[in-house]
């Protein structure tokens, strides 16, 4: 929950640092591209905190792998000496696992909205947002957690009243029976169809599953909203309806 003092940097601070250096590179790359196209448009990175519930069950059942891969012996040593929760990660080795609680509110929402409405490109909720717990007197305390970036992005899009949520990933479309002889790419999904596939275990946890869950939540949050999941390089074609998987009611 709230982070204990130790010789290891608090996880919330690690997320904040990640937001800073990723935002720095992304902001400059976007600005350069805009200028190359003759566009005088502002680009801003907002250090973003996301509120979670300190009583979220995720804190009792950490599942999010972070950090370096270790041997079983190394992992067990860290568990004994540092109190880490550890787990094997898809046969690739052992890693620390931390809580991944549900995002509840974006603290800097008003600032992000103001920047966007002033025609700025806004980079926000990096790494899922800095996890914080609201205490008495409106204080915010860093939490030992990593928030799912897809769910955090959905929450932000929903509260900004966006028409479309675009989730860019490493494949052009969502598939069922992925990497099997009977694999099938999906052009469109209703929330009901998506839930059926989720129930069948069609989408891998930590990979496509949170993307589909975020897309379903956004599509159902307000009539007329659509979510798109596609490949980064195919974003334009996806927006134009030429590729990608669309999730809508």
Question: PLM features: residue spans?
Answer:
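C-terminal catalytic "cap/lid" subdomain
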Residues: 1-249
